Amino acid sequence: MMNTPNKLTVFRVILIPFFMAFYLIGSTWSQVAALLVYLVAAATDRYDGYLARKYNQITTFGKLMDPLADKILIMSALICFMQRDVRYINAVVIVIILARELIVTGIRLIAMGENYVIAASIWGKAKTVSQFILTIAVMVFELGSKIIPQLEVVFDTATLILVIVAVALTVISGWDYIWKSRKLLTFK
């Protein structure tokens, strides 16, 4: 039977197509709906891990799916932003973030197969938080630009800063993860 933290993780994944559909419609009401769906999905990320630790319900499924659900949610948002030509969200940003996620996921799978534990780092947590802040801020800024068009330059500048921070933390956390797993990655 699936426990509550795992149900929350699955629920987060189920919300992704709804978020994407609402966002890509592009009307004001659908952007509000997309933001609300995204906020609910992001909130489940906070609570599934908390509940799993609090009630000792940590599972292999959760260890794999929770970070994967985060990656899918964030990448879905970034791809939607690129599709809608959101300034500063381009293929280079997406490739850097996706490459890091694929490399780290690959290392994580190898580590699990070898019963090798790579401790979570503050860099990985900061990376995830920065990506969630970026994706939520972009949606808020888009809505804000419709309400107060005069602030568009401010929103653009803030988006650029958030993109730089998210990409920098993505690269740093990826390097940190590779460095911590160097013994595992020694090819024999």
Functional labels for PLM-detected ranges:
Residues 1-188:
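Alpha-helical transmembrane bundles and membrane-interface segments of multipass inner-membrane proteins
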